[in-house]
């Protein structure tokens, strides 16, 4: 255990925060404005202990006031043993590269703020319809996470700086607290606790909260509920040590690159150093970091040039654990931005002046010349246009309005907690650019689909045979198309209909021949049959007769040379054959029906 702490060198730490928020808690934790008004002012001093241990008192409450959001307190913590135990338990790399520039008071503020960031109010349990008195508030305990909402506190070295980060606290409440501090008589009081007991209490606090899920996320949420912004020492992050944490405008972020110096510059506001993850005012940064010179934003071109000249002389110390073998150079972001801002103004070069700058040779086959003059504003970028004195001046630098708008948007996003790197999702889905060139089968009727699949759209005469689709090669239109089932069904219906029609004509012809024969009663020579008028005959019969006459000659010649055959058909068939072989009378004309029947009978051979 460390030696006995020096009580004279132990400075006081001031702690401030809300003890509760109205209408935020439920059950016995809820505190109403009527209860607070009845309990104020307290009749006795209210102690400040650790984790509700009454034998581990490290400070005292200076004042409690009623704010519109809830009871707000300001207290003092001065315990040399607490500083000694925390200093001995902290790792040597806990403060990173700021270990040599931080004072003992600042180290104590970092350790206490991050180890005990919240408070828990212990009050008297009230019975139903009981009105509280001045003994309602029992004590205030420093802890990791309190049960009530918005109970994260802020530690600092002065009363004014401890209540300053509470932006929602009214100015009247702040003035009343500061007036009560002047009347407080215990500013030089010291509270002593055994180091062994204090070490056990601190260890018990860590053990009892180690299973709390996402405790730093809960602390960050409670801090935002309390309205704390611009705080200095609270690091609500899961990273180990202060070198892995950044804190910009009260918004935490988890960054894996520990130990890299990276500062964010805000005009007239604090500077947040990524190497330490804390925010300090411009004056404090100049005092604590001698190798960094804090400058305000440039207001004109002469200021930009002066800032660029000063930034070129900056030689920051590399942090511990970072290789410095010439692989890279560590430059704070704020001064790198100022350096780029000072170099955006293009120099006025007279025509014909010699160019002694560096020339860069482009790759083989590049459309640009092998060498073009350097441009500090657009180095590493392709040439923008050809209208400058050299021909390739690069992209024009942004004007002052664009810079101001960019700074305004960044500040607005940081205030509202908006991540500008997150891609936007509030946009419509991308439309298919190839959709107009695709085939639209839904708008086609069945005939179009059949003609398209079969490739025989010329049969109906309404659609072209070679359908062309935009964007499709010519040879694709002539490829074999897939034939739909409806096409074959239609072809089958057409062929069956033709056969049925022919069979009907033949049946009608046979019926007509039978009727003519029945009128005469007996078989007569063909010359005695009367001719049937042309108007009463089916025109399709004449067409079929002409087609059969061309075939009858061949069939008759074959019958004359062939041997006679024995026909076992009935008497009607023999009669028809006899009539067909009867000689024609000279000068008579044969009837078309008889000729057709004769040819049909001859065709049977």
UniProtKB/Swiss-Prot annotation:
Q: Which Pfam families match?
A: Peptidase_S21
Keywords noted in UniProt: Host cytoplasm, Host nucleus, Hydrolase, Phosphoprotein, Protease, Serine protease, Viral capsid assembly, Viral release from host cell
Q: Where is this region: Interaction with pAP?
A: 326-344
Q: Give yes or no: UniProt keyword Hydrolase.
A: yes
The annotated active site, in chain numbering, is: 52, 120, 139
If you read the UniProt record, what top EC class would you report for this enzyme, in one word?
hydrolase
Task: Cite the residue spans of the region called Interaction with major capsid protein.
Answer: 585-605
Site features described as Cleavage, chain residue numbers: 236-237, 578-579
One GO BP annotation is: nuclear capsid assembly
Q: Which GO terms describe its cellular component?
A: host cell cytoplasm; host cell nucleus
Q: What is its EC number?
A: 3.4.21.97
Q: What highest taxon heads this organism's lineage?
A: Viruses
InterPro entries the record matches: Herpes_virus_sf, Peptidase_S21
GO MF annotation: an example? serine-type endopeptidase activity
Report the domain remarks.
Region of interaction between pPR and pAP is called Amino conserved domain (ACD). The region of interaction with major capsid protein is called carboxyl conserved domain (CCD).
Give the family this protein belongs to, as stated in its UniProt record.
Belongs to the herpesviridae capsid scaffolding protein family.
Q: What is this protein called?
A: Capsid scaffolding protein
Gene that encodes it: 33
């Amino acid at each position: 255990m460390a030696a006995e702490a020096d009580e004279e060198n132990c400075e006081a730490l001031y702690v401030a925060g809300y003890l509760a928020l109205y209408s935020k808690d439920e059950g016995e934790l809820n505190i109403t404005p009527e209860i607070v008004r009845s309990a104020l002012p307290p009749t006795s001093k209210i102690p400040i202990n650790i984790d509700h241990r009454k034998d581990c008192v490290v400070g005292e409450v200076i004042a409690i006031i009623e704010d519109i959001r809830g009871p707000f307190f300001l207290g003092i913590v001065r315990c040399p043993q607490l500083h000694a135990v925390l200093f001995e338990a902290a790792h040597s790399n806990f403060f990173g590269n700021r270990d040599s520039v931080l004072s003992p008071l600042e180290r104590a503020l970092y350790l206490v703020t991050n180890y005990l960031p919240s408070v828990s109010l212990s009050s008297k349990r009230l019975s139903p319809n009981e009105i509280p008195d001045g003994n309602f508030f029992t004590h205030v305990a420093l802890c990791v996470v309190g049960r009530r909402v918005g109970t994260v506190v802020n530690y600092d070295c002065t009363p004014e700086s401890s209540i300053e980060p509470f932006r929602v606290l009214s100015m009247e409440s702040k003035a009343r607290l500061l007036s009560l501090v002047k009347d407080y008589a215990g500013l030089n009081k010291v509270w002593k606790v055994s180091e062994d007991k204090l070490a056990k209490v601190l260890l018990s606090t860590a053990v009892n909260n180690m299973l709390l899920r996402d405790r730093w996320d809960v602390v960050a949420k409670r801090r935002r509920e309390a309205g704390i912004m611009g705080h200095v020492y609270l690091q609500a992050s899961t990273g180990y040590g202060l070198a892995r944490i950044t804190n910009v405008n009260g918004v935490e972020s988890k960054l894996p690159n520990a130990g890299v110096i990276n500062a964010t510059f805000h005009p007239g506001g604090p500077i947040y150093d990524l190497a330490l993850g804390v925010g300090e005012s411009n004056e404090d940064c100049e005092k604590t970091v001698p190798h960094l010179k804090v400058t305000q934003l440039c207001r004109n071109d002469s200021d930009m040039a002066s800032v660029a000249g000063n930034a070129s002389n900056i030689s920051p110390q590399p942090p511990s654990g970072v290789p410095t073998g010439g692989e890279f150079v560590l430059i704070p972001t704020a001064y790198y931005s100022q350096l780029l801002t000072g170099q955006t103004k293009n120099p006025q070069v007279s025509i014909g002046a010699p160019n002694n700058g560096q020339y860069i040779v482009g790759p083989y086959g590049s459309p640009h010349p092998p060498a073009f003059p350097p441009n500090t504003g657009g180095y590493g970028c392709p040439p923008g246009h050809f209208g400058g004195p050299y021909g390739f001046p690069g992209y024009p630098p942004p004007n002052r309005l664009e810079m101001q708008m960019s700074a305004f948007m960044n500040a607005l996003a940081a205030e509202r907690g908006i991540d500008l790197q997150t891609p936007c999702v509030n946009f419509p889905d991308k439309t298919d650019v190839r959709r107009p060139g695709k085939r639209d089968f839904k708008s086609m009727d069945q005939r179009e689909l059949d003609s398209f699949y079969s490739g025989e759209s010329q049969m109906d005469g309404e659609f072209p045979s070679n359908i062309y689709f935009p964007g499709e090669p010519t040879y694709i239109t002539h490829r074999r198309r897939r034939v739909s089932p409806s096409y074959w069904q239609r072809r089958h219906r057409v062929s069956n209909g033709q056969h049925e029609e022919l069979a009907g004509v033949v049946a009608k012809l046979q019926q007509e021949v039978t009727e003519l024969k029945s009128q005469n009663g007996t078989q007569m020579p063909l010359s005695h049959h009367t001719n049937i008028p042309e108007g009463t005959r089916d025109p399709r019969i004449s067409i079929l007769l002409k087609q059969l006459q061309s075939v009858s000659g061949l069939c008759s010649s074959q019958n004359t040379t062939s041997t006679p055959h024995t026909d076992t058909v009935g008497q009607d068939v023999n009669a028809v054959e006899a009539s067909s072989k009867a000689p024609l009378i000279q000068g008579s004309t044969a009837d078309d029906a008889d000729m057709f029947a004769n040819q049909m009978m001859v065709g049977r051979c």
